[in-house]
From Swiss-Prot:
Glycans are attached at residues 31, 93, 141. Residues 114-130 are annotated as: Immunosuppression. The chain crosses the membrane at residues 193-213. It comes from Avian sarcoma virus (strain rASV1441). This is Envelope glycoprotein gp95. It comes from the Viruses. Residues 58-78 are annotated as: Fusion peptide. A lipid is attached at residues 205, 208 (S-palmitoyl cysteine). Residues 1-192 are extracellular.
Length: 246
């Protein structure tokens, strides 16, 4: 340890591996993101039962909620974001279904047009006429973009699947932190974290609870002593024996 450390209390982060500073944490996160390893996350896709009724607050409600109850405002914002995501997923699914039905209709119309053209050509040949006898019959162009449309449908479905709900954020964080660990290890670490949180809460809250209980007991004892003192004073003032005073 240098005799003249520079940096105040934060200098401890430069002396031990267990307390890295902010720059070291950013470097570790940057190196882990460059590995390119995709880890499994506990993300579930939104289904048709989710609520898509978006009801945004007005300016007055937002201002009062932000000043008086910031936690309520944040919870309301998260709820509306979830409903907007549900609305977007349902809207994309409806759009994909509608475009798929239109593609089926266009395909059937295409087949009908080709059949009619074949019938017209057959009738013209049967009567000894060629396509040159009718203006515009020799050139027939019917474009087909079904393959491109199918690819775009697939892209739309992939984009919809990107919207999901992380049902186990702690487990996802542990998997991202420790790499490809098994589910049993994830459950074990979650149990250890839960126990650590409970112990920390007890360490933080137990002195306060003990102080409150001791204060109440001390107050009760003081009240009892004061009542007994007042009782003695009343006995001396009225000169009545203790046995006759109830």
């Amino acid at each position: 340890i240098p005799s003249r450390p520079v940096g105040g209390p934060c200098y401890l982060g430069k002396l031990t591996m267990l307390a890295p500073n902010h720059t070291d944490i950013l470097k570790i996160l940057a190196n882990s993101s460059r590995t390119g390893i995709r880890r499994k996350r506990s993300v579930s896709h939104l289904d048709d039962t989710c609520s898509d009724e978006v009801q945004l607050w007005g300016p007055t409600a937002r201002i009062f909620a932000s000043i008086l109850a910031p936690g309520v405002a944040a919870a309301q914002a998260l709820k509306e974001i979830e409903r907007l995501a549900c609305w977007s997923v349902k809207q994309a699914n409806l759009t994909t279904s509608l475009l798929g039905d239109l593609l089926d209709d266009v395909t059937s119309i295409r087949h009908a047009v080709l059949q009619n053209r074949a019938a017209i050509d057959f009738l013209l040949l049967a009567h000894g006429h060629g396509c040159e006898d009718v203006a515009g019959m020799c050139c027939f162009n019917l474009s087909d973009h079904s393959e491109s449309i199918q690819k775009k449908f697939q892209l739309m479905k992939e984009h919809v699947n990107k919207i999901g709900v992380d049902s186990d954020p702690i487990g996802s964080w542990l998997r991202g932190l420790f790499g490809g660990i098994g589910e049993w290890a994830v459950h074990l670490l979650k149990g250890l974290l839960l126990g650590l949180v409970v112990i920390l809460l007890l360490v933080v809250c137990l002195p306060c609870l003990l102080q409150i209980v001791c204060g109440n007991i001390r107050k009760m004892i003081n009240n009892s002593i004061s009542y007994h003192t007042e009782y003695k004073k009343l006995q001396k003032a009225y000169g009545q024996p203790e046995s006759r005073i109830v």
